[in-house]
């Protein structure tokens, strides 16, 4: 079975960021409704993420993705219509999207494998803020995701349900120059295939974060968390419970009206519990230089929402719970660009190079190692272009290249692969 990378119901660019996906909407009182539907047809060179010597199976793919969001009218729109409007007592946003996937094998020998892959992925989310933009406020959120993710053996898959639910309290005295939040989040991951059911787990995360603004376009930031991860179904499957701890301190501010810098650094420790537990205990960090292409328009550091036209260059280092071994450490170097040309053509480009390090991997009973520590660089590059024929209809192209650059073999599984995807689509949105 293959250790594929995470997939989600949000492969489409317009689902990942509402700035790209939503149109004018339907206004009813203090609420906005944004329905939409997209259809795509394209090519996938290696859906099963197989190594070059394991018969990569190319295919044609079709995706149909309806979506709908409902939210209260934003503060900026309220102020634009009636001056300095009083913040609402409650604001919320709910969203639901689903993707139906169909496959056509390009090699007749792969027809049976692909006939079993048609599936539906979906995501739903809810965010609720109580007494927003006041000295004391609260937030509640929940989301549920069904991920469709193949292994390199077509008879098995990593399809799973992931849910989160959390709440927090925020204190913001003095007109919002200072704010501090404490929160709790519960997470549950459930694998549908019985071959991977033992990987199901639950997490509890207690977090806090603070911000102090000064100068007045700069802020000192702090965040910290303590987590508890448990594998309940089979403690002998080789996966270890853990209590990860993270703490970071940093700065976010404008260098000029069009250029901002985020820099955060701290320490993280994994605290895995069990025989031959492999631990991460070291630096975690993030740095990002962002260019606001349209000066002073919607810059969130100037008091508005993030605009569509931005570019960013960044680096992030963190450790993550892993289903292959105990954890992996990712050093991600990334570049992003999004720009709306003349209100008609949207271009979004994302690229990343991520050396990913794994510690020594042990077999299920944790007594014998199955592979020494190794690093497998990961490459991801996505380009999305959409021409909007009107305020509600667009034609788009999505291309994506991804690769795991390694020849490491773990338990007879070659972890190296590369994949190219290209889709032509149409989208209606309000």
Q: Where on the chain are the PLM-derived regions?
A:
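Sec/Tat signal peptide C-region and signal peptidase I cleavage site
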Residues: 3-9
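Gram-negative and organellar
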Residues: 9-430
């Amino acid at each position: 079975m293959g250790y594929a990378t995470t997939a989600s119901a949000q492969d489409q660019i317009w689902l990942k960021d509402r700035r790209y996906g939503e149109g004018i909407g339907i206004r009813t009182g203090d609420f906005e409704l944004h329905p939409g539907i997209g259809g795509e047809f394209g090519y996938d060179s290696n859906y099963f993420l197989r190594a070059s010597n394991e018969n990569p199976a190319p295919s044609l793919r079709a995706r149909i993705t309806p979506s709908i969001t409902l939210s209260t009218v934003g503060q900026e729109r309220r102020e634009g219509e009636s001056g300095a409007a009083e913040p609402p007592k409650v604001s919320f946003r709910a969203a639901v999207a689903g993707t139906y996937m169909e496959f056509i094998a390009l090699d007749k020998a792969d027809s049976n494998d692909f006939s079993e892959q048609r599936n539906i992925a979906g995501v739903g989310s809810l965010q609720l803020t109580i007494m927003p933009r006041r000295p004391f406020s609260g937030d509640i959120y929940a989301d549920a995701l069904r991920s469709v993710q193949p292994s390199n053996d077509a008879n098995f898959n990593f399809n799973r349900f992931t849910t989160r639910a959390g709440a927090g309290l925020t204190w913001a005295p003095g007109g919002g120059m200072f704010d501090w939040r404490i929160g709790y989040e519960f997470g549950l991951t459930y694998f549908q295939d019985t071959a991977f059911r033992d990987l199901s787990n639950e997490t509890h995360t207690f977090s806090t974060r603070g911000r102090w603004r000064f100068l007045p376009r700069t802020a000192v930031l702090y965040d910290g968390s303590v987590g508890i991860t448990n594998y309940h179904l089979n403690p002998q499957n080789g996966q270890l419970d853990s209590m990860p701890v993270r703490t970071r301190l940093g700065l976010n501010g404008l260098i000029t009206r069009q250029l901002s810098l985020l820099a955060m650094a701290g320490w993280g420790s994994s605290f895995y519990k069990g025989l031959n537990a492999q631990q991460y205990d070291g630096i975690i960090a993030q740095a990002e230089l962002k260019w606001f292409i349209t000066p002073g328009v919607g810059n969130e550091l100037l008091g508005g929402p993030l605009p569509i036209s931005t570019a960013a260059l960044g680096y992030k280092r963190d450790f993550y719970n892993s289903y292959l071994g105990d954890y992996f450490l990712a050093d991600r170097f990334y570049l992003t660009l999004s720009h709306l040309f003349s209100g008609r053509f949207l271009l979004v480009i994302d690229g990343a190079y991520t050396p990913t390090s794994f510690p020594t991997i042990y077999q299920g009973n944790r007594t014998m190692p199955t592979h020494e520590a190794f690093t497998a660089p990961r490459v991801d590059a996505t380009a999305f272009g959409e021409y909007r024929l009107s305020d509600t209809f667009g034609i788009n192209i999505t291309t994506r290249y991804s690769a795991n650059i390694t020849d490491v073999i773990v338990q007879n599984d070659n972890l190296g692969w590369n994949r190219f995807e290209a889709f032509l689509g149409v989208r209606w949105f309000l």
